[in-house]
A protein has these predicted regions:
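Conserved ABC transporter NBD signature motif
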Residues: 64-72
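Conserved ABC ATPase signature
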Residues: 142-146, 150
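ABC ATPase NBD coupling module
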Residues: 73-90
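Conserved catalytic motifs of ABC-family nucleotide-binding domains
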Residues: 163
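Helix-to-loop junction immediately C-terminal to a conserved catalytic motif
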Residues: 56
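Conserved ABC ATPase "signature" region
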Residues: 121-138
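Short coil-to-helix segment of the ABC ATPase nucleotide-binding domain corresponding to the Q-loop/switch region
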Residues: 102-110
Length: 242
Protein backbone atom coordinates (compact mmCIF):
# COMPACT_ATOMS: atom_id res chain seq x y z
CA UNK A 1 0.00 0.00 0.00
CA UNK A 2 1.11 3.54 -0.76
CA UNK A 3 0.46 6.04 2.03
CA UNK A 4 -1.95 8.90 1.24
CA UNK A 5 -0.95 12.58 0.99
CA UNK A 6 0.12 14.04 4.33
CA UNK A 7 -2.43 16.86 4.19
CA UNK A 8 -5.46 14.58 3.83
CA UNK A 9 -7.16 13.55 7.07
CA UNK A 10 -9.41 11.22 5.07
CA UNK A 11 -8.38 9.53 1.83
CA UNK A 12 -9.84 6.89 -0.46
CA UNK A 13 -8.14 5.30 -3.44
CA UNK A 14 -10.00 3.59 -6.33
CA UNK A 15 -12.93 2.32 -4.29
CA UNK A 16 -15.06 -0.40 -5.83
CA UNK A 17 -18.06 -1.92 -4.13
CA UNK A 18 -21.15 -3.86 -5.17
CA UNK A 19 -24.44 -4.62 -3.44
CA UNK A 20 -25.77 -8.06 -4.32
CA UNK A 21 -23.93 -7.99 -7.61
CA UNK A 22 -25.02 -4.47 -8.52
CA UNK A 23 -22.07 -2.03 -8.79
CA UNK A 24 -22.32 0.93 -6.40
CA UNK A 25 -18.79 2.37 -6.66
CA UNK A 26 -16.57 2.01 -9.69
CA UNK A 27 -13.10 3.32 -8.90
CA UNK A 28 -13.85 6.45 -6.86
CA UNK A 29 -10.89 8.28 -5.28
CA UNK A 30 -11.10 11.29 -2.99
CA UNK A 31 -9.08 13.13 -0.36
CA UNK A 32 -10.42 15.44 2.35
CA UNK A 33 -8.27 17.85 4.32
CA UNK A 34 -8.62 18.57 8.02
CA UNK A 35 -11.36 21.11 8.68
CA UNK A 36 -12.64 20.93 5.11
CA UNK A 37 -16.26 20.50 4.11
CA UNK A 38 -16.70 18.25 1.10
CA UNK A 39 -20.08 18.00 -0.61
CA UNK A 40 -20.78 14.71 -2.38
CA UNK A 41 -23.65 15.33 -4.77
CA UNK A 42 -25.52 13.23 -7.28
CA UNK A 43 -28.88 11.64 -8.00
CA UNK A 44 -30.26 8.74 -6.01
CA UNK A 45 -28.34 5.57 -6.74
CA UNK A 46 -25.16 7.42 -7.71
CA UNK A 47 -23.10 5.86 -4.90
CA UNK A 48 -23.11 8.66 -2.32
CA UNK A 49 -24.26 6.60 0.65
CA UNK A 50 -21.97 3.71 -0.22
CA UNK A 51 -19.02 6.10 -0.43
CA UNK A 52 -19.79 7.60 2.99
CA UNK A 53 -20.22 4.16 4.52
CA UNK A 54 -16.86 3.04 3.12
CA UNK A 55 -15.11 6.22 4.28
CA UNK A 56 -16.56 5.85 7.79
CA UNK A 57 -15.63 2.19 8.14
CA UNK A 58 -19.19 0.88 8.10
CA UNK A 59 -18.42 -0.99 4.89
CA UNK A 60 -15.16 -2.54 3.73
CA UNK A 61 -14.86 -1.91 -0.01
CA UNK A 62 -14.54 -4.86 -2.35
CA UNK A 63 -11.44 -3.17 -3.76
CA UNK A 64 -9.51 -0.03 -2.90
CA UNK A 65 -8.21 1.68 0.21
CA UNK A 66 -9.54 4.00 2.92
CA UNK A 67 -7.18 5.95 5.20
CA UNK A 68 -7.82 8.13 8.25
CA UNK A 69 -5.02 10.22 9.76
CA UNK A 70 -2.46 8.25 7.79
CA UNK A 71 -3.66 4.84 9.02
CA UNK A 72 -5.50 2.30 6.85
CA UNK A 73 -9.13 1.74 7.80
CA UNK A 74 -10.02 -0.93 5.26
CA UNK A 75 -7.61 -3.47 6.78
CA UNK A 76 -8.76 -3.00 10.37
CA UNK A 77 -10.91 -5.67 12.06
CA UNK A 78 -14.55 -4.88 12.73
CA UNK A 79 -13.96 -4.10 16.42
CA UNK A 80 -11.30 -1.51 15.59
CA UNK A 81 -13.53 0.12 12.99
CA UNK A 82 -16.41 0.22 15.48
CA UNK A 83 -14.15 1.93 18.01
CA UNK A 84 -13.04 4.45 15.38
CA UNK A 85 -16.62 5.33 14.56
CA UNK A 86 -17.54 5.77 18.23
CA UNK A 87 -14.51 7.84 19.18
CA UNK A 88 -13.60 9.87 16.09
CA UNK A 89 -16.58 10.00 13.74
CA UNK A 90 -20.08 11.42 13.83
CA UNK A 91 -22.92 10.27 11.58
CA UNK A 92 -26.29 11.69 10.67
CA UNK A 93 -28.52 10.28 7.96
CA UNK A 94 -31.78 11.25 6.30
CA UNK A 95 -33.67 9.30 9.00
CA UNK A 96 -32.98 10.38 12.61
CA UNK A 97 -33.05 6.87 14.14
CA UNK A 98 -33.64 8.17 17.66
CA UNK A 99 -34.20 5.81 20.58
CA UNK A 100 -37.91 6.16 21.44
CA UNK A 101 -37.46 5.54 25.16
CA UNK A 102 -35.00 8.44 25.54
CA UNK A 103 -35.76 12.15 25.63
CA UNK A 104 -34.38 14.57 23.06
CA UNK A 105 -31.46 15.59 25.25
CA UNK A 106 -30.67 11.98 26.14
CA UNK A 107 -30.60 11.04 22.46
CA UNK A 108 -28.38 14.01 21.66
CA UNK A 109 -26.06 13.21 24.58
CA UNK A 110 -25.79 9.51 23.78
CA UNK A 111 -22.26 9.64 22.28
CA UNK A 112 -21.01 11.37 25.42
CA UNK A 113 -22.82 9.04 27.81
CA UNK A 114 -21.37 6.03 25.97
CA UNK A 115 -17.90 7.46 26.55
CA UNK A 116 -18.48 7.71 30.28
CA UNK A 117 -19.13 11.46 30.49
CA UNK A 118 -21.17 12.25 33.59
CA UNK A 119 -24.85 12.85 33.03
CA UNK A 120 -24.84 16.49 34.14
CA UNK A 121 -21.96 17.45 31.83
CA UNK A 122 -23.40 15.43 28.95
CA UNK A 123 -26.78 17.07 29.40
CA UNK A 124 -25.25 20.55 29.38
CA UNK A 125 -23.38 19.89 26.15
CA UNK A 126 -26.41 18.31 24.52
CA UNK A 127 -28.56 21.27 25.56
CA UNK A 128 -26.09 23.68 23.95
CA UNK A 129 -26.35 21.91 20.62
CA UNK A 130 -30.12 21.59 20.84
CA UNK A 131 -30.32 25.33 21.52
CA UNK A 132 -28.17 26.09 18.48
CA UNK A 133 -30.53 24.02 16.37
CA UNK A 134 -33.61 25.82 17.81
CA UNK A 135 -34.88 22.66 19.48
CA UNK A 136 -33.74 23.38 23.03
CA UNK A 137 -37.26 23.90 24.36
CA UNK A 138 -38.10 20.30 23.48
CA UNK A 139 -35.14 18.77 25.31
CA UNK A 140 -37.36 16.78 27.70
CA UNK A 141 -39.71 15.45 25.04
CA UNK A 142 -39.57 11.94 23.65
CA UNK A 143 -39.27 11.43 19.87
CA UNK A 144 -42.95 10.49 19.49
CA UNK A 145 -43.90 14.00 20.64
CA UNK A 146 -41.58 15.76 18.19
CA UNK A 147 -42.22 16.88 14.63
CA UNK A 148 -40.18 15.26 11.89
CA UNK A 149 -38.04 18.37 11.49
CA UNK A 150 -37.42 18.44 15.25
CA UNK A 151 -36.36 14.79 15.33
CA UNK A 152 -33.91 15.44 12.53
CA UNK A 153 -32.36 18.36 14.42
CA UNK A 154 -31.89 16.14 17.46
CA UNK A 155 -30.03 13.69 15.21
CA UNK A 156 -27.77 16.48 13.97
CA UNK A 157 -27.06 17.53 17.57
CA UNK A 158 -26.16 13.93 18.40
CA UNK A 159 -23.68 13.84 15.51
CA UNK A 160 -21.94 17.03 16.67
CA UNK A 161 -22.09 16.79 20.46
CA UNK A 162 -18.80 14.93 20.94
CA UNK A 163 -16.91 17.21 18.51
CA UNK A 164 -15.80 14.33 16.26
CA UNK A 165 -12.84 14.63 13.91
CA UNK A 166 -15.08 13.85 10.93
CA UNK A 167 -18.84 14.21 10.55
CA UNK A 168 -20.49 12.12 7.86
CA UNK A 169 -23.83 13.64 6.89
CA UNK A 170 -25.82 11.53 4.45
CA UNK A 171 -28.51 13.84 3.07
CA UNK A 172 -29.33 15.03 6.61
CA UNK A 173 -31.86 17.64 5.53
CA UNK A 174 -33.71 15.48 2.99
CA UNK A 175 -36.96 15.09 5.00
CA UNK A 176 -37.21 18.80 5.87
CA UNK A 177 -39.00 21.71 4.24
CA UNK A 178 -36.79 24.15 2.34
CA UNK A 179 -36.44 26.73 5.13
CA UNK A 180 -35.70 24.07 7.75
CA UNK A 181 -33.30 22.37 5.35
CA UNK A 182 -31.28 25.55 4.85
CA UNK A 183 -31.13 26.26 8.58
CA UNK A 184 -29.96 22.76 9.47
CA UNK A 185 -27.25 22.77 6.79
CA UNK A 186 -26.09 26.25 7.81
CA UNK A 187 -25.91 25.26 11.47
CA UNK A 188 -24.17 21.97 10.73
CA UNK A 189 -21.49 23.51 8.53
CA UNK A 190 -20.92 26.68 10.59
CA UNK A 191 -20.62 24.62 13.78
CA UNK A 192 -18.17 22.28 12.09
CA UNK A 193 -16.05 25.20 10.92
CA UNK A 194 -16.02 26.84 14.34
CA UNK A 195 -14.84 23.58 15.94
CA UNK A 196 -12.40 22.54 13.20
CA UNK A 197 -14.42 19.46 12.26
CA UNK A 198 -14.12 17.86 8.85
CA UNK A 199 -17.45 17.20 7.14
CA UNK A 200 -18.40 14.88 4.28
CA UNK A 201 -21.87 16.07 3.31
CA UNK A 202 -23.89 14.05 0.79
CA UNK A 203 -27.02 15.31 -0.91
CA UNK A 204 -29.22 14.99 -3.97
CA UNK A 205 -29.99 18.72 -3.96
CA UNK A 206 -27.33 20.66 -5.94
CA UNK A 207 -27.72 23.48 -3.39
CA UNK A 208 -25.83 21.27 -0.93
CA UNK A 209 -22.64 22.45 -2.64
CA UNK A 210 -23.25 26.01 -1.43
CA UNK A 211 -22.22 25.02 2.08
CA UNK A 212 -18.99 23.25 1.11
CA UNK A 213 -15.40 24.06 0.18
CA UNK A 214 -15.30 21.47 -2.59
CA UNK A 215 -17.76 19.30 -4.46
CA UNK A 216 -17.44 15.73 -5.67
CA UNK A 217 -20.18 14.83 -8.14
CA UNK A 218 -21.03 11.15 -8.59
CA UNK A 219 -23.09 9.43 -11.24
CA UNK A 220 -23.59 5.69 -11.61
CA UNK A 221 -20.83 4.96 -9.11
CA UNK A 222 -18.22 7.04 -10.91
CA UNK A 223 -16.73 10.48 -10.36
CA UNK A 224 -18.45 12.88 -12.74
CA UNK A 225 -16.57 15.99 -11.59
CA UNK A 226 -14.60 17.41 -8.67
CA UNK A 227 -14.57 21.17 -8.19
CA UNK A 228 -13.86 23.88 -5.65
CA UNK A 229 -16.89 25.94 -4.69
CA UNK A 230 -16.15 29.57 -5.45
CA UNK A 231 -19.39 31.14 -4.30
CA UNK A 232 -20.48 29.04 -1.36
CA UNK A 233 -22.91 30.57 1.10
CA UNK A 234 -21.21 32.33 4.00
CA UNK A 235 -22.28 30.52 7.19
CA UNK A 236 -23.76 32.34 10.14
CA UNK A 237 -21.11 33.30 12.71
CA UNK A 238 -20.79 30.84 15.57
CA UNK A 239 -21.56 32.05 19.11
CA UNK A 240 -18.52 33.25 21.02
CA UNK A 241 -18.95 30.55 23.65
CA UNK A 242 -19.43 27.72 21.14
Amino acid sequence: MVAPPDNDVLFARTLRHSHRGSPALLGVSVGVREGEILAVVGPRGSGKTTLLRCLSGQLVPDQGEVWFNGAPVHTQPAAARDHLRRERFGWVGSEPQLLPELTAWENAALPLLMRGVRSRAARAQAQEWLDRLDIGAAARKHPARLLQSERQRVAVARALVATPAVVFADDPAAPLHRADRAQVLRTLTSAARSHGMTVVLAGTDPDTARYADRTLALRDGRTESATAVQDRETPDPAPANA
